[in-house]
Swiss-Prot record:
Matches recorded under Gene3D superfamilies: Ribosomal protein S7 domain
PANTHER family, sorted: RIBOSOMAL PROTEIN S7
Family affiliation: Belongs to the universal ribosomal protein uS7 family.
Transmembrane parts of this sequence: none
Phylogenetic lineage: Eukaryota, Fungi, Dikarya, Ascomycota, Taphrinomycotina
Identification of the protein by name: Small ribosomal subunit protein uS7m
Main location, first listed in the record: mitochondrion
Compartment annotation: Mitochondrion
GO biological process: mitochondrial translation; ribosomal small subunit assembly; translation
Keyword Mitochondrion set for record: yes
Gene Ontology cellular-component terms listed: mitochondrial small ribosomal subunit; mitochondrion; ribosome
Stored SUPFAM superfamilies: Ribosomal protein S7
Gene Ontology terms, MF aspect: mRNA binding; rRNA binding; structural constituent of ribosome
Residues recorded as bearing Phosphothreonine in the entry: T157
Length: 259
């Protein structure tokens, strides 16, 4: 009997306690939702206030004033850039042109020392001659020899020495050379055309070869003597050129035919 009576009383007490806890929980959730709703409203109001402050409403007069200021600043910067470019162009036009052609070398009456001390114009033909004269990497010495020779040529001819040198090289430069090859266990020679640099190299080698057997002591004087001999058609370089061309004509039958 005691067990039967205690059990329903325990159940009623436990059920009443659960109902009380559930009511308290519901009340707390409602108050939390109401507080959350109010806090969300305050947050939205703050966001709207910040947006209004960061994005102020411009009236038409303010916008026009701002656009005018921007346009004036752009026009001023563009005008400054244009004036700067114009001043640069004027400075470039007013600069003196570099020494070219006949202005490269001084008059024949001037001294040789001043010409040797200053660097002469870089020309492919002159540099080729300097490189062929150079020994043991002493390029400054070779440049001094060539500059002295060119200054003497100018004094004797009264013309631009570089043009005189190029003309002399063009007169003695060959058009072809002989190349040897083996055919059927037999060495034959056949002509091959030369490029411009190859022709110039052979001509300069012939000039320097003739300078070895000349009488003047200085190499610059011997170069001048050989170039003047080429201008007067009395140099042995013409004989070398004619002999090479004659041998090329004799061996023209051995030239390979390429289809």
């Amino acid at each position: 009997m005691l067990r039967l009576i205690k059990q329903p009383l325990f159940r009623c007490a436990s059920s009443g306690h659960l109902m009380k806890e559930s009511l308290v929980f519901i009340h707390q959730t409602r108050t939390f939702q109401v507080g959350k709703f109010t806090s969300n409203e305050k947050y939205n109001e703050k966001i709207e206030d910040i947006n209004e402050r960061s994005n102020p409403q411009w009236d038409n007069a303010g916008l026009e004033n701002l656009l005018n200021q921007l346009q004036d600043s752009v026009e001023q910067s563009a005008s400054d850039d244009f004036m700067g470019e114009l001043e640069k162009k004027i400075e470039v036009e007013n600069e003196e042109p570099p020494l070219m052609g006949t202005n490269l070398w001084p008059s024949p009456s001037s001294s040789i020392v001043g010409l040797i001390d200053r660097p002469f114009q870089v020309d492919s033909t002159v540099q080729h001659l300097v490189n062929l004269i150079m020994r043991d990497g002493k390029k400054a010495k070779a440049e001094k020899i060539v500059a002295t020779a060119l200054s003497i040529i100018q004094k004797e001819t009264g013309e631009n020495p570089i043009d005189v040198l190029k003309q002399a090289i063009a007169e003695i430069s060959p058009l072809m050379k002989l190349v040897s090859a083996k055919r059927f266990n037999k060495s034959v020679e056949f002509p091959m055309p030369l490029k411009e640099r190859q022709r110039r190299r052979i001509a300069l080698q012939w000039i320097l070869g003739e300078c070895k057997s000349s009488s003047p002591k200085r190499l610059s004087d011997r170069i001048v003597k050989e170039i003047i001999a080429i201008r007067s058609k009395t140099s042995n370089c013409f004989k070398k050129k004619d002999h090479l061309h004659r041998m090329c004509l004799v061996n023209r039958g051995n030239a390979p035919v390429r289809i």
